[in-house]
Design a protein with these regions (language model features):
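Basic nucleic-acid-binding interfaces
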Residues: 2-9, 15-99
Length: 99
């Protein structure tokens, strides 16, 4: 993973099915992978991380919903600290090319 990308995990608890579905789609569109219900993982740039925060503001109700973004190192730790996952569940980042 290059210096421009960070490995992150996004976890959320969203009451409304419609808002939860929209957030799920938005996180997939950013390039994150769902690894559990309401948990996403992947590599993002600083701009993509800001886009996630904007989606939280746009979609979530601060009185009812919760979400967090944390830096992680699951590729390195998955074999030691995870149950039910393999290294294949956390593949290396692929290059991003400008067309």
């Amino acid at each position: 993973m290059g210096d421009l990308h960070r490995e992150i995990m996004v976890c959320y608890d969203v009451e409304c099915n419609k808002r939860r579905s929209k957030l799920f789609d938005a996180l997939k569109d950013i390039g994150l992978r769902p690894i559990q219900k309401s948990v996403f993982w992947g590599d993002v740039t600083a701009a993509e991380r800001k886009a996630i925060q904007r989606e939280f503001i746009r979609l979530l109700d601060p009185k009812m919903d919760f979400a967090i973004v944390v830096d992680v190192h699951l590729r390195d730790a998955s074999a030691r600290n995870a149950f039910g996952y393999s290294a294949a569940d956390f593949p290396p980042m692929t290059d991003h090319h400008v067309l």
